[in-house]
């Protein structure tokens, strides 16, 4: 059953059962004091409402029959997946730079199996959800995301998570180039950096690459669909 979501710059219509809700990198690294972003000097003090809004969006999406995909950004314990000096990631990843500048943190940031890598306690994947590791900002790079989506006939992606201006925007942009329709729920995302980074990312998305809505509007759009499915 199709539903129409009020969004910027215009409404978008989609079938929830052919749509995925993507939760980007809601790990301690990005959303919890003492995690990577916090240790690297980024403000994570306002992430709690984002976590609550993601919980709300996930519940509504699951009720409507949407696929839920959780991303976790990071690398193996030896950081082979992060790339060496021949990779731009080695030079631009703030996690890698922070560990080089603070040797006591070596091996603690974004390493698989670490507290930093884990999803925040409030967000727990359920049976039927898909959890994907990713080694770079985009969720399409070196992951099976495209295959997973195409095999299920999914063409619409609803994005939540951190950071709006880095991994969320990178994944949505790559999806745009692969012919996916991307929507960001702005109050279920958070930027890395000053507030203007959030505004700039949302401007780019709604102007060039996708659509922007919010959690309440998303839930309202799905509610009639869910009732119709139950009936």
From Swiss-Prot:
Catalytic activity of the protein: (Z)-3-ureidoacrylate + H2O + H(+) = (Z)-3-aminoacrylate + NH4(+) + CO2; (Z)-3-ureidoacrylate + H2O = (Z)-3-aminoacrylate + carbamate + H(+); (Z)-2-methylureidoacrylate + H2O + H(+) = (Z)-2-methylaminoacrylate + NH4(+) + CO2
EC identifiers of the protein: 3.5.1.110
UniProt xrefs under CDD domains: cysteine_hydrolases (cd00431)
GO biological process: nitrogen utilization; uracil catabolic process
UniProt-listed InterPro entries: Isochorismatase-like_dom, Isochorismatase-like_hydrls, Isochorismatase-like_sf, RutB
Keyword check for Flavoprotein: no
Entry's Gene Ontology molecular function annotations: hydrolase activity, acting on carbon-nitrogen (but not peptide) bonds, in linear amides
Induction: Up-regulated by the nitrogen regulatory protein C (NtrC also called GlnG) and repressed by RutR.
Top-level taxon: Bacteria
Family annotation (Gene3D superfamilies): Isochorismatase-like
Top-level EC class: hydrolase
Keywords carried by this UniProt record: Hydrolase
Residues annotated as the enzyme's active site: 25, 134, 167
KW Cell inner membrane (keyword) present: no
Record's function text: Hydrolyzes ureidoacrylate to form aminoacrylate and carbamate. The carbamate hydrolyzes spontaneously, thereby releasing one of the nitrogen atoms of the pyrimidine ring as ammonia and one of its carbon atoms as CO2.
Family according to the record: Belongs to the isochorismatase family. RutB subfamily.
HAMAP family: RutB
Protein's name in the database: Ureidoacrylate amidohydrolase RutB
Species this protein is from: Escherichia coli O18:K1:H7 (strain IHE3034 / ExPEC)
